[in-house]
Swiss-Prot record:
This is Phospholipase D beta 2. Induction: Activated by wounding, methyl jasmonate, heavy metal, osmotic and salt stresses. Up-regulated by phosphate limitation. The gene is PLDBETA2. Its EC number is 3.1.4.4. Pfam families: C2, PLD_C, PLDc.
Amino acid sequence: MENYGWNYPYYPYRPPRPNPPYPAPPHHHGSMSHSGPLDHHHPPMSYYASFDYQHQPPPPYPPVSYYASFSSHSDLSYSGRLDSSGHGFTSTASPHSPGMHIVPFGKASLKVLLLHGNLDIWVSCANNLPNLDLFHKTLGVVFGGMTNMIEGQLSKKITSDPYVSISVAGAVIGRTYVISNSENPVWQQHFYVPVAHHAAEVHFVVKDSDAVGSQLIGIVTIPVEQIYSGARIEGTYSIRDSNGKPCKPGATLSLSIQYTSMNKLSVYHSGVGAGPYYQGVPGTYFPLREGGSVTLYQDAHVPEGMLPGIKLGNGMCYEHGKCWHDMFHAICQARRLIYITGWSVWHNVRLVRDKEDPSSECRLGELLRSKSQEGVRVLLLVWDDPTSQNILGYMTDGVMGTHDEETRRFFKDSSVQVLLCPRNAGKRHSWVKQREVGTIYTHHQKNLIVDADAGGNRRKIVAFVGGLDLCDGRYDTPQHPLFRTLQTDHNGDYHNPTFTGNVSGCPREPWHDLHSKIDGPAAYDVLTNFEERWLKAAKPHRINKLKTSYDDALLRIDRIPDILRVLDAPTVSANDPEAWHVQIFRSIDSNSVKGFPKDPKYATSKNLVCGKNVLIDMSIHTAYVKAIRAAQHFIYIENQYFIGSSYDWNAHKDIGANNLIPMEIALKIADKIRAKERFAAYIVIPMWPEGVPTGAATQRILYWQHKTMQMMYGTIYNALVEAGLEDEYSPQDYLNFFCLGNREMVNGNNESGTGSASNENTPQGLCRKSRRFMIYVHSKGMVVDDEYVVIGSANINQRSMEGTRDTEIAMGAYQPQHTWARRQSGPRGQIYGYRMSLWAEHMALLDDCFVEPESLGCVRKVRTVAEENWEQFRSEEVSEMRGHLMKYPVEVDRKGKVRPLPGSEEFPDVGGNVVGSFLAIQENLTI
């Protein structure tokens, strides 16, 4: 299993804004620095007294009720104005002028309202903060090391290191950087934040950053009712302590906040849009690149004739890509560089497995060695699994079995350079945080970058991006065999982590994935990502400074005349029916890349977000939210995980799985129901997370997944009631979850290799007898309205979306000639062909209704096929399955209540509760 998670809140993007709504105060004491990992809504230090830091991490933040005593009915002192005529309180003086007068808001409202849109926030400054650091700075010196003493820091004035966290419904949506040693900090920091929260108040929590945690200084609350009209609230507020009293006489926070609802945000009203003015996803690190080419892949290989032909709108037939075949030939044809990033890279994997192809016996390691001997620069940037070791030649495989040490050893005496890259928290983080990040999180990107022929004796950059690692267990075709290829295509490549012990005669775990190839300017952004990561990972640290530096391994392509630069890269005219516009997104932070601004004040200029001691690119989350909000007809998702929007669950609201994606989908459907318009969401996930389904971690993930489903179906049911449609339609007429599975009969070749007796009452024995197993959905992709596609390495959970956990990369792309806005009807371009090809793979049929996925007829047809396949899968009778798409084994009643499917409370053969169990395991391992 690749993905567990720790429970940190998420941080949205903040596109730049030219000027703050009010001037900065004339004074500022203290130097600026950003420090520490992501913030967790820490209360005073006494709150943590009962926690053993060596055996469990501290809680992320207290529940919302923690703040109730000092946020709900406190008399909030306020000065300033509401930016709409006839509303609010005004001050004729500048918010910072000596003549400013304080006007109380009165009792704060507790009315809960839905904030669905964007918040435009400025946090300007604080004044007269209390000094909380005299005691805790001393502790920081003792526990944080003696370097401060060496540098003479103790001679400086010791006072608070303040920052501000902004939260809605208990979910942190933004935070300022830390300003060291200042009682009058000036941030002038802008936030442009997507929200999809039911909330009564917006909290601005002022904290003091310490080496051993954070202390609560005080809080300012803004009632949602005050901003719901869209008026801008702007002013200076008294900072209150936990008793509702000023934390210090004269302690204030200056801010402004404005809410814009979805119906006023035109960028979300017309999908991709038409014309030259569409700028892609705003507020991201990499821009939209026009005039590229994209190839979309399903599975590692699609043999000729395995899938039916699909007619496109231009009269052409959709061409099914052969991912690993194309990767193999791209490597073979490289002349200058081959760069690979991976969660896992195995030198012994075979990319080509067609019997008639002479390359079928070539191993990846041999190919890369051969290319490096030709003078090609071959660099591998692979996650360093901390549980694998190579000590004095003795290697341990590691818990994840990534082959990292094995692959490094294979290339040891070659010119191929392998850099094993641990997931580091950064030296300015606490020791606890460094251990936490290094042990739990991973480098999860999967890329291949090569130079390719550009004509005229010139070279260009081509990149492959998606979910497929170049390692064992990944090669598969749309047939997803269980037993029949164990002695052929999968000989020496058996992978099924569900089983422990003897696996003789057991089914392999079929692997379904999505990938892409990018040819054009956006490929250079993938190269930039590799270069930024390599330079950061290659930088020597501490004792490693004695080792060889990898800094000079990267090719300087600007000094190689025959490689075209990004501005010179060949492009396709936007009028060409096959043109693509492509944008690269990431989840990554400044601890994993070199090139982010050193001063957090400049984060906004790069569309980065501030965390404690870290700058964050979380543009994958931004891209998903933008695409879902802009969807007009349907959403099709395949993903390895589906967990999020925990702030709106019916329990465990505070675990920190705060990404917006599930809630945005549910609210999109609810909006369409109220508008009496059709909309459908299809979500394909694995039957269970990879591993043992009865295990504590797996059960906890399934439990969170169930909570996510329940929240979404509940939101949809409420919308049906509001529209008076609850008797006519059910929630599953709009949203459905599916999984994939296969079942094979024994053929005459006795391909199964029966092994030990098949009547043993173990998962192995039961699977040998039933000849069935799930197809593992490892995909990380989304299709919206057949006009926009997202494919990458990021799962839909907190660790992939947050930016400070796993490092991720994705591409978002569309064809400008194949959009709803241009055609005024359903697009029939490559994205349409890709989605139809995936459905043909999963259902073994192409129905006429599939061309309109939003239609009720299509939704019910797909659900019927999936229900029939599930019944065939769970039956005692062994039969050959043609289609693989199955109903996820839960029952959703007309009121949106989600329960295990009767008779299928546990997964067939392998056990484990379908809706999971709340077992005693740290939730930060599973979100």
